[in-house]
Every structure is written in structure tokens, then in C-alpha cells.
């Protein structure tokens, strides 16, 4: 029995402790320890060593608790040292495991509580409590971690944990791929993480690996569940799967079927205005002849709880018999009714809907009569008010425009007189001018990783300049046209009230502010805080004719006052006289705000004043000692209200100056008494001799508080030495200052202004109180450093470090510096994303907090909060303050609402046009309703209900306006509604949080941030998702509340998106535990999260566009040329049934783009015609996942189980044909075509791809890709902001500034036979992606073939899976060239139009049928006959210079510079990408380039026509694949065989005319180029001044950062063209361990690969740099899903097998080079082609695996590797260098028009209409960017000599690099001279051979020198021009990517 004694004693000790019998507990502990002592020798009867260790630790902990309670502190401390020493010596993990075990059994709580109480009370007899504090921290960390694990979210994890032994924290929710888990950069680098256990990134490689394992194990479980389910699949799932797999989906499900008439009541789309609503629909189905109804079922899962079948009756029109329907019925099975020979039969079906929350709900009902198609009907209900917020419309009265800044070059500026700027201020403004060149800003210090002692000044100077440019840019967005009321005087009410009178001929002007300029918007905040002058331009009644050479006058006016509603201006005498202004009249003026540069100049000045920055980088190697004595601790003069921690702080501050201390940090959240503590310390310091105190605060109100509440009463009590001097800003209006404070200020005798202090004034006072801004006055008084002995900075966390150091210029090493603040509150706002990345916004307090070790004595946390309820404190303590806070105040709670309460609203967040903000109407109504309810139930204990009682906080201005408006309607205007930024320092009895964001627009990152590059906090993502990702924002908001925090939001989104999801998990779990989770159950949240993560067949897209077979689509587009449109503004997206469910419920999209948040232009496809029957084969199931925001596509049964594939949801309105990524294995299923697979929309963040089931992860081939595209697309579409090419005045809005509106010519497109190719219409409707956002880059799509069906034969180390190849004969040469010549010489001349950007999308369909011609007879609706053969022969080879899919341009006329008769350059209609039939759609997202699948729609042969006839019925919709499948004999380009080069073969590429810098210009064009160019603020491109007058709104231009993004994404990764592929073209040659032979043998001998010959397809045809030689990690080569049709061969195109009797797709043989020589023109870029190969199809094509390097918001450009880019300006595969030269010569001969005979018929589609001019580089998308290999080639790879020669020839002959710079491209990474040489020399030496001319960093710093235009303008020195040169992104406008180049 003895071996159980110790354990028993330990248990008894625990019981005694809980009973508070401490002496007995002590006794039992001692017994247990003594018992354990005897087991120290090897005793086989005793417990095992681990058990001994556990009992020992437990007993010691109980002993410590008992000793503390018995006040035996010394013994407790000794035991504590013992437990820590032993526990940690044996490994911290083991020790923590014991603690976790105790916590799970509930044994840790009593110990932890006692420890916390002991340490937060009085100091333990003055002893040092370092060990006890450390133990307490360990215990609280353990409790936090364990409680998170137990919070209910990870029940399944705990289950797994018990069996699989998981050791780390549970992973974050909402992850849809194990690749999304990341490592926490901050933790790895600094060993601490602000998020603690709540961090969504792993804190070690081991934790990361475990998370990935857990994810995999959950996926396996899901797969098993699916396999089990498959045996007994439900009717609904079977039906959906059948529909998905059907060749003719409309034959499976349809909205109308023959012989059944459907009537419904009410409308299918209903809006209800109350939250608690009930709705029923009755469907009457009249069957003639009579038929049996077998089933009625509801299909859509996500909203199932809200819908049910309530009644079914059957009979004739007069008598109905009710059928039995179970309760909450989801599927009713009938078939038992007798029809008694009736000729007709009527069924009535009742569907009920119930909701108690606001939101949008959808359902699909199917009625199965035993025949197909099955009838379906879709219903939608919107539980939200749809009233327009009229006042918001009213707010649009202020016309906000973007225009050129007014400066002395464009206007005559009349300065305001008298000018009150002091000489010192003038000198500062002059001294700190923004440097004029980039290399002065981008110094090494800015590019350094962090702030150091050595780079301190230079780095902060540069970042301040960069921030100034960003502020300037933000403020430049506003020209306001306003009615200015002229006043002679005005009155202000309130505390700061008083009257002001104009004197000396001056007048006041007043104008009203609207939401546009309130503190709630970014720019508004800037205007309210950083602007003190405006330029004013009178708007004349009639437009005056301006004479040449005269400049308009603008007048400077100063801002006199800013109130919440008005701004008051002071107008100068000269202005009033010249404009003849009179009081009490109105005049219309245009205003431009002028940034006040002075505060930034003062920060520069402060930086230069800091002589010794050692104070700012304290040495922490030696721990300082703060002397302690009982006399000091219990000094009677200390205020008795001070708690222990506050006393500790006072002791540290008042430590004798002889003892040097680093800056003392007093950390504490609001409500812990920081100001009180500092004030007590001041009183104490004044008792020491020779001390002088400087108190600095961030705000005037806080400074006044010291005087009013502390110093004034102290002076009045008889302490004259404490008399403070309050220094105020000299222009502050005296009347606005509190009377008590007046007596401590220096006020001029006239009592009108404050005076600047003189040195004597300072010497007279021992206490000086200033704000950080006014502290600079003291610096100007020549006070010697060290004059103040103590410098106390309050609110130190709210100021940037540059502001905080102003007063520190007066400090020395001996000065006692104290910083008080809350490091977890919001940091100051910085407008420049670049500066934010480099931590310009971080406060000194924040930086030192991280610099000091955890238990540093100068880092004191005040931990008793007196303001909030205990539940609120405990939550914030646990999550934000390491468990150290405790509630000391007694705040009453509400009887009905627990202090943490959650109200569910399932709305959708929307972004308005011209707004960077979001709103969510469902939340607006929920908040208002709950506010009303709370007011009715206001407890007496909460006191009077007044203005400060209820606060509503949200991160977005738009939501603020909407909630205010709704409250106003309910007469609840006393409720405070604010943005979080504006509530710091305020407090409310009740606080409502509206979180706004949902998965509707927040797409979770689909790719990992590069490991170890986890986003840094305060990155763009934080700003972007508000409460979902910025923990400081969340903490700031929650800590405002005293008794109740009520959150209104979408719980699924909160728990699955953003870096705060674990904080929200905990919040919702607490609400659940306390029964305060309303509107959804905890179980539902868990189920939906699991469904979301594991991609069950849970949700399908309710907004799914209707399926129209391709053939019908073509007919329809022929019958209408209506534009696709978005829902009207101000109207609910789901307002009518038409909007939602009919394919022509269409409204015109508004082309305006967001101000400050540009998004991409997007062109919808043509709508379908007016034949409802033909066009109506709508999607039967709602296919949007409400949680991920993605659409979901069922995968056919070959996968086993109802696996679902996520596909992007491009547009949430009707009539838009969906673009879905389809797995190639279901290409055989017509359902794929139902989704218009060839028009595949790029994936975005929101489309998780379930490659987990044995498919390739997103990094399969590792290609960067536009991750943000779909997000933008989604936002844009959702708001109807689609940029369509509207003719008329709106056309201007979608052009870049230099594009003037053109009148599109009406062209008879049908007259060109090529235009009638089946794909020419749908193929061009690609959304442009040239408006990037700030998301991470994603790996690009690569068309990866499916792996072998037998995983066991998978070949390791193989980058690309082998493919079968069959030889295939070449085609005869088509006779199309004459026609082409005719077309290509047909460019219309358009003056005034500069080459268009690839930012928009070609809108060919809209014109395709404008002048219809009688079509020739067709083979099938999908394949038109006749001259269309040209289409089948169209070229499809690698097209090096074609822009990516998204880069196609809306119809625009060709540039003016290329006159019709003289230019060899031709516009090319973009045969739009038929987006990749992704060979594995489980690969990643966003193929931004010309997709590989494009091949499928353009290689068609004459042989194909015959096959088409045979296959017509089956393959009507397969236009792009048919020719392949039927063995059309399009030739493939072959490998290098010089003897075959002469063969005339049809082209396989669309020839792209290269951009030439020296285009032949017409006279008018030349004039235009002569004009000097200035930069335009949001554009990187330049435009001439004459064009600027007509620019569109700045907000609508592509943001500067777009260049950087495309720089990574869009540059082609192949090196320049080579004469013919050298030996390195062998695709296996990249991998050292493979050669062709080995591969052949290996594959050929493998029974699993019967037909697999060496595939020459996937590897790029050039040598890879050495770093890319490694094979990919094994995880990227996961085996694919098994192919289940054993008797069918698996073929790469049709998926594993193709059952339709078509032969397998042949591949090109590896021999025979293929070079086209036709009309003296060599084919461009004949790279080896395979329709599914990943050709270098666009400039964004093929980086190698290693180059996959997405950039997160926190990932600056210069940290990324240089990737290759392509220059294929002239000819890629020319037979000889001479040919190359000849061809390039032709390029330079501008009059030689005949030399450009393009051989691709497709290339001239629609020539005479305005077509894209493809080679114009814009925003980084140029094809002509110089290859990185030429600039800085990888050292290890030397291309073969012939390749180098060819590269050089090409580049040198035809490519002038300056055009890139001139047109807004990136600078070369070598000096211009060198480029010129390489561009004009014809020496065989390639630049690739040389060393890199310039490092990347130096390229960043080097000022790029553009090719000067004929007359180079003098560089403008104003900040805006400079901004455009640097094109830095500002946080709101550019959202985060900036280019560092010109």
C-alpha cells in the first residue's frame, strides 16, 4: 500500500486547499514529499519516475499556496525557487505538461488565485517576488492555453489529442489547406509574441508540423465519412451529383418542364423589414396530363435550419387531399396518390421560412415527377430594411474631384496676409524640403531590417519624408466645390464657446462638412488634423474664356475653426476686395486643402536635436536595481489610494538620480490609474531638492487634467513650489481653455493670445506642462540638456517615436525618463504603407516594451482596473495582458445580458462606390434594434441614461453613417456612434461593436506567407479587416465598456478569418458558456466551421448564374447586344426576383472606381437573348459558400464521396455566366461546360481548393500569382462597380488619364470571317486584373497533368508528371494571309489617344452583332462553317508578348501615334483566354497569364469539321475542346532540327508587334510627345500636361503599387527568344538526376505508364538558374485521386479516361523544329507547344518552383529575389541570327508596312473596331521588360552561346529600353548608358554574359533616368510630383504595394 501514500497525501492537500484549511493542506503536502523521498533509490514497488515528478510538483505548489496564505513568505519563496529550478531543469515541456494536467483536473485554479492575490496586494513584506511572479506567469499562461484548447472549438482536436498525443496549441480555424499555416516571425525573431496563445501562426517548426498533421488527419476522417455516406447517399446529393456530371445539365434540372404549369404566391424573392419574420410560399403545380409527384426536397444546406416543407396536398382543381408531412420536413416522399384517370392533376406545396436574425437566406426546392428534367424553383428572402439612406445621397452634394494640384506653375497664388509664420518655422520649412531624387530617400538605412543606434536619424528622416508624400497624396484627392457662406462674425457654443469678429477688411467663410470629410474617413481625418490652410478658386457663373498665357488666381485662406459640422475660413483682405465679397451672401468656390508641413518638419528638427541617442537604446545587459525600503514603501506622504503596483511605479520614478535607470515604462490599460500614479510621483519628486519636472502629454485635454485635478488643488493646499507653467500653442484661442488652467498660462496683455515662454519663465517654475508639439518651444530656448531632472511622458503609446523624442532632446543619461501608456491600444496612424512596414508608427513606449526583457524592473504593469466589469477585465486580461489584470471596481451587470454578449447577424458586407469603407445592413438593423431594447430595459444601477451611456463602435466610416442615420430615424440621436479611432480615452456604460466584415469580401489567404515571413502586425491586413485582424483595434474598443460589451456580427467569419480569430473564438465560447450567444447555437457554429474547413458538400452557390449551353449562348449573343449590368445603386442586390433569377435582369454597371481603393476594371460577358426557354437552364443548387464566399462545384463520382470543389464566385448578380475552375477529370462531363469552363475566372483568396484529397497543394509548381484579383473582382462586382466600356460620357471613367474618350466605330465584324470563330465572343470577356490590391501574391496556375493512376509508381523527385505523347502530322498551310494583310492595314486614325492600358477588358461581344450579316449555314450552333476554317488553323503557339488574359482592353481606337498608312504596328484583338482547363483544378488560383487552355480553342483543323458533325449532338457546348478530341491535326512545334526550318507551316502563335520607343509619329503625335510629361499622382505612367486637364478622377486610376505587383506577376519568366531551342530545351535537363534516356526507360518500362513517352511539355525550354535545380519538396508531389474506370485509359485531357470513343489526344513528337516562314516573316515565339502544357503564354508565365514567393502585406519588394522576365520584342524562334536581324530591321523601318504580315488569322479579329493595342506597357504589364537574366543572370547558369547570341541580337536590334521608363515601366537594373549600348549594338556579346550591373538594393536607390523627351521639363519639386516618381503606396489609396522605382 505504501506506493499509493504519496499520491493520497497530495490529493488530501488539494482538498484541504479548496476548503481553505491551509494548515492541514501544508501538513498533507509535507507528508507527500516525505513519502516521495524514500523512492529516490531504485525501488521497484514505487511509482514510476514521471509519476514521482508529478506528485512532487503538485505538492510543492499546494505548499507554496498554503505558505502564502499563512503569510510565511520566505518559505513560499524558497519552495517556489525549488519548484522552478527542478521543474525547468527537467525540461519546460514536462513541467508545463504537469501544470496542464492540473488545470484540466481543476487543481491549478486555487493555487493560481492565491498567487495572484498575494502578488497584487501589498508587497510581500517588501521582499523581492521575482520567482513567485515568474511562477504566476507560468500558471496564467497554462490556464490561458488550456482554456483555449477547451473553449469548445477544438473538441475534435482534444479527441485526437487523446489518441494521437498532440503536444501544441490547437491550430486556428477557417484554414482550408495545411499550406496556410505559417510561422510567427515575431516569435522566431524576438522570442515573444503579442498574440500569445491566440497567435494564428505557429511558434515553432514542431508546432507547424503538428498543425499540418492534424489537418491531414481531419481530412482523412472526412474522406472516410464521405466513403461511408456514398453507400447511402441522400436523394439531394445524388441529384446534385447527377446534375453536375450530366452532359446536358438542363436535362436533369430545370425551372420549367413540359406539361407542368407552376404558380407561386408570393414572389420568389421577398424582402422583410422585421428581424423575427415568418414567410410561406405556396406552389401550385398543374399537371396536364396528370402525373405522379414522387418527391419534394430542399437542396441548399447552409440555410436549411430556416426553411421547411409544411404542407402538400393533391387533387383536381376543385378538391384537394392533404398529404402527411413530418415536422421540419426537408424531403417529402410521395407517389402514393391515386389519380383516378383525371386529365389533369394539381399539387399544392407549402414552404415555410422562419428567422430570428437579420440576413439573406436562399433555398432551392425540387419537385420530382419521376422523369427528368426535375422541376426546381428558387426562393430568396432578405431580412433587412431596404430603405435608402436619403441623407447619404444628400451628402453627395459636395462634388469631390481629383484634379491637378494648384501651384505657381498653373495658377497665380495670392498668399494670405498677414502671414503669422515665425522665422524659426519658416527656416524649418525651408530646411526640411523633401529630397528631389529617389536615391536620397531610399538610402540603406531605410532598407535596413530594423531601427538601430547607427541608422536612427537617417532612417527616421527618410521615413518621415515618405510619409509626407503619402499624406500629400491623400489630401490631393480632394477638390471641393462648396457654397461658401460669407460672415463678418461667428459664434461657437459649448465650453470653448465665444464670438469671433473679422477685422481689417478680412471676412470669414463657412462651409458645411459632409461624411466625405468627417473625422470618420481617412482623408477627412487628415483634413481635420493636418490642414490649416486652403486654396480657394472662385467658380464663375458663366464659363469665362481664358486668354492664352493668363493664369487663374487662387487665394490662400487659413482655417479658423473646425467643428463637427462646419469649417470656418479666414479670408484675406485682398481676396475679399478682388472677389467683391460681402457678409451674409453665398458664393460658390472650389477648394484645395494644403497640408500643414510644420509638424513633420518639427519631427525632423527633433531628430536632429537628439545628440546622444543612447537614451533611446538603453543597455539591458545589466538588470538595474530599484532600491526598496519599508520607509519608502509605506511613506505616509504617499496617497493611501495607491495600490501595490502603483506604489512600485512611484518608487521607480522617485529613485534617487544618482542611480542611473533606463527609461521607466508604466504600462497599463485605460482605467488602471496611470495619470494618477504620475501625479503622485510628481508630488513626491518636488520634495527632493534641485529637481525640475517636464510633463508632456499627447493631447491638450490630458495636459490640462494634470493641472485641474492634481497640481491646482496641491498648490491651493499650500505647496507653491508645485505651481506649474502650462505652455500653449500661440494661436490657440484663449477662450477655449478652461478658466482654472488660465492662471498657469502666459497670456498676452491683450488677453487674446498665448505667449511663447522665455527662458526666465521656465526658470521660475519647477513644473512645466506641455504637449509633445509645444515641447519644441522649449528646445528653442537654449535650455541645456539635463535642465529637467525628470521628464514624464503620458499617453506615450499614442505618439510616433519621432514625436515622443522632441522633449527628450533636453535629456541626458542622468535624466529620469518615464513613459506611461498602454502598448495594447491603437498606434498612431501612418498614411504610407511603406513607412508603416518599417514601423514609423510604432511608439517609443512600444519599442522599449519589446526591447526590455519580461521581468525587467523598469517595465511596470499596473494591473488593477477600476473601470470595467470583472467579466470584461478577465477577458482582456487573459487575451491581451498575459493574465495580469484584475478587476478592482464594482460595476453592476445587466440582469438579462451577461457583460460579454454576442448577437448574430448574417448579412453581407458591401463596399460603396468611391469609398474605402464597408457597411453591413443586417448589422445596422440588429444594432439599432438592440439599442432600443436596452434603453427599454435600462437598469437603475447604471444611473441616468445620457449621451455617454451607450456607444456604438465600428471600424468603418460607412457603417458609422448608416447606424447614425437609422438611429436618427428612431429618434435615438443621443447614442454615440464612432469609429474606433475616435473613441480612445472615452468610456461608455454599454458598448456595441459592429464587426461589419464577413466571408463575403474577406477571403482568407489561400497561400502561406513565405515561411518565417508571417505578416507583421499593423500591416494592411489589420487595417483591412478591422476587428477581424487588428488586435489593438479590438482591445481599444472592448476596454471602453464599463458594464456590457455587445458584439453584433457573423460568428463564422469572426472565427475563421483574420489574425484575431482566436480572440473571437474565446469571446463566443464565453458567451456560449454564459448563455449570451443569441441568434445561433454553438453547435451550429462548430458544424459550419467544420464544413467550411473540410469542404463538405455543405454549401453551393445561391448566386450561381444560370447554365446556358455554349451553342445557345452564341445564338443568344447574336440576338442581343445588351450590356451585362450590375444592380442599380441604392437598391438591394436581391430586391426583385428579376434581379436575381433572370438572365436579363440587368442594369448598367457604374464605371466609377473606389476613391483610394482602386479595383480592377471588369467586363461582363454579353447577356443571353430573349429566349427564356433556351437560356433557362439555371443552376439547381445554390452554389455559394456563405462562409468562404466561394462558389462550390460538385466533383463527379469518380472521386468517391460528395467531394466539393470550390470555384470562384466572380459576380453576385444575375445574367453573368459563371467562370468556374473545373478539374480536368470532369472535363468529360458536360457539367463542366455548363460552367463555361473556357471562360474560367481566376481564383482568388476566397476560393479554397481542396487539393487535400490527394491533389496537388497550391504550391505544386510554385508560381506567383495574383491573389488579390478575385477579391477585387468580387468587391467590385458586388457593388456594381464594374468598369464596362460604356460609350458616351462615362467612357472617360474607365480610361487611364491619357486616354481620351473615343467614339467606337460601328464595324461590320461579321464581314471578317475570323470574327466568327466560336470563341471570339465569349473569349474576350476577361476581367482585368491590373488594379491590384494589397493581398499576397499566389502561386500561379500551371496546367499540371494528372499523375499516374497508380500512386505506388509515382516517380520521386519529378517536377512534372509524365504524359503520353503521340506523333501528329502537321497541317496544310491555310490561305489566310491575304485577308490578314487587308485587315492589318486597316487601323483607323485617332488623334489624341495615347496607347491604351491593359487595364480593361475587350468588349467585343457588344459589337459583334451590331451590324449582323446573314450567317452562313452552320455545322452546329457551336461551330460555324465557311471561312471559319481560319479559326481552326489559328495559331496557338507560345505568344510571348501577348498580355495576360486580364489585360485585354475595352474597345478603343488604336493610338494616335500609329497612323494607318505608315505604321508597322497593328492593334490586335485579343482572342481571350479560354482559361485553363486546369489539368488539376486543385492546383492554385489566378492564372494571370494567357491560359493554357487557350490552346484548346484555337487549334482546330479541317479534319475536325467532319468529326464535329458526328459528335455534334454530344459536344455542342464544347467549342474549345472539340477539335482536339476529334484529332484535329494542328501541328505542334518541335524541337531543334535545323534541316526542317524551311518548312512552311501554319503559325502557332499570335504575332505581337513589338513596342518601339521610336515609333513613327504623325505630326500631331510628335507634338504630343514634345510636350513635357509630369507624373500623375496615382499613376506610374506619365502624361502630358495637356492631357491632364481631362483626366478622370484620381481614384479611378490604377494605383501606383500596381506596377510592383505586376512586376512580380506579369513579367514572363522565360528568357528571351532563342534561334531554336538548344539542347537545354530538353525538359528534363533542369534536374540533374534525369536525362531523356533515363526518363524514357523509366517510364516506358513502367506498367503503370503504358503510353507515357518522355513528356517534353512542362519544363520551360531554357536553363533554369541553379537555385531552381532542386526537385520540389515531396509534399508537392502528392499522388492524385485514383481513377475508377479500370477499363479506360487515363488520358491527360479527359481526365483519367475518356469514355466517348474519341482517340486520345496526341502529343508532339520530340523531333522536327517547327519554324514558320511566310510572307518573309518568321513566326514569333514558336516554343514547343502542347495544349495543356504550361507554355510561356503570357508575361506572367513560368517561374520555377523556387520562385514562388508571394508577397504579404508585410513583405517589401527588396527582400524578394529577382525573377526572370521576358523580352521577346522581335522574334523568338528565328531560323538564323541573320533572319533575326532582318526582321528587327523591318521593325525599325516604319514605312515598311508590308513587312508586317501577320500570319495568324485570329490576330486581326475586329481590327477596324477599337481593339487592344497589345504592346503598350502599362503598370508593369509590358511584355517588353528586359529579362532579368540579361540584367543580373544567375551566376551558375550560362546559356549556350548560340542562345546568348540570339538573345543579344534580338534585344539589341529591336528593343529600346527607354520606352519602358517613358511609359511608366520599371527602370533597368543597370545604368541607362549600358542599356543604350545593349539596345543599339549588334555585338554578339550578350549582356547575359556579364556580371550584374547593379545590385537590387542599389537599383532601388538609384534614381532612374528616363529617356528625356525632346524637351525635358524641369523636374517639379512639389511633393506630389515626387510622390509620383517614388510611387509609394499610401495605406488607403494604394492598399499597400508600392514600387520603389520611377
Curated annotation (Swiss-Prot):
Which InterPro entries does this UniProt record tie to the protein? DNA2/NAM7-like, DNA2/NAM7-like_C, DNA2/NAM7_AAA_11, HELZ_DEAD-box_1, P-loop_NTPase, SF1_C_Upf1, UvrD-like_ATP-bd, Znf_CCCH
Gene3D superfamilies according to UniProt: P-loop containing nucleotide triphosphate hydrolases, Zinc finger, CCCH-type
* Low complexity bias locations: 1399-1412, 1623-1636, 1731-1745, 1876-1888, 1920-1942
May I have one GO cellular component term? membrane
For this protein, the record's PROSITE patterns field holds: ZF_C3H1
The transmembrane residues are: none
Q: Where is this motif: DEAA box?
A: 794-797
Q: Which residues bind ATP?
A: 668-675
Which positions make up the signal peptide?
A: none
Question: Which residues get modified to Phosphoserine?
Answer: 248, 1614, 1645, 1738, 1741, 1766
Q: Which residues carry this modification: Omega-N-methylarginine?
A: 1245
Q: Which UniProt keywords apply?
A: ATP-binding, Helicase, Hydrolase, Metal-binding, Methylation, Nucleotide-binding, Nucleus, Phosphoprotein, Zinc, Zinc-finger
Spell out the protein name for this chain.
Probable helicase with zinc finger domain
Q: Which source organism does the UniProt entry give?
A: Homo sapiens (Human)
UniProt gene name: HELZ
